[in-house]
């Protein structure tokens, strides 16, 4: 989508909406959908309730994805980093690390003091962009790996969710039944069901649902 020329994008939006009045279009608000990047170059948002501009949020990825971009780290130690950040928890996690590279990365992450205020400031950037252009904004992806310590993961999910809701930004968790999503067991839906076939059902993690402000899902 973002490779299209701006005029072509606008023309395509008009054509898509004209072809189906029930259609809701999602367009990236930022290059590569990440708020680490600049707003999509040449994008002139269409102020239409059926066009929603989305972005992704996984910051800091050293926490939410345990720095998956960097091989050779002690991820078991990295998974102990706290959220919200606190000095004592960071020191304890660093002391457990097996190598200097992991300790250095931990020091970098902890020095940024990620907490509700910092997350809120990042989400506010997208919310402000939407207000400035009078368009709806959606956090179309966010999540944290289940390998992260549970208190940090659940706190991060709740903080991001609340930051969105406080600013009128819609949100959608990354996955349904994978390690960054709602499910306890990513293979549950594919297990054999009584009488043949597969169950087609995933077991929802109640703690995750609670962090997201959702009730029990049967």
Regions found by a protein language model. Give the residues of each.
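Aromatic- and carboxylate-lined catalytic core of secreted/periplasmic carbohydrate-active enzymes
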Residues: 103, 110-111, 121, 127-128, ...
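Aromatic-rich peripheral "rim/lid" segments of glycoside hydrolase catalytic domains that contact
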Residues: 148-218
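Soluble or luminal CAZymes and related metallo-dependent hydrolases
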Residues: 1, 5-9, 111-122, 152-156, ...
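Active-site region of glycoside hydrolase catalytic domains
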Residues: 1-113, 124-144, 166-167
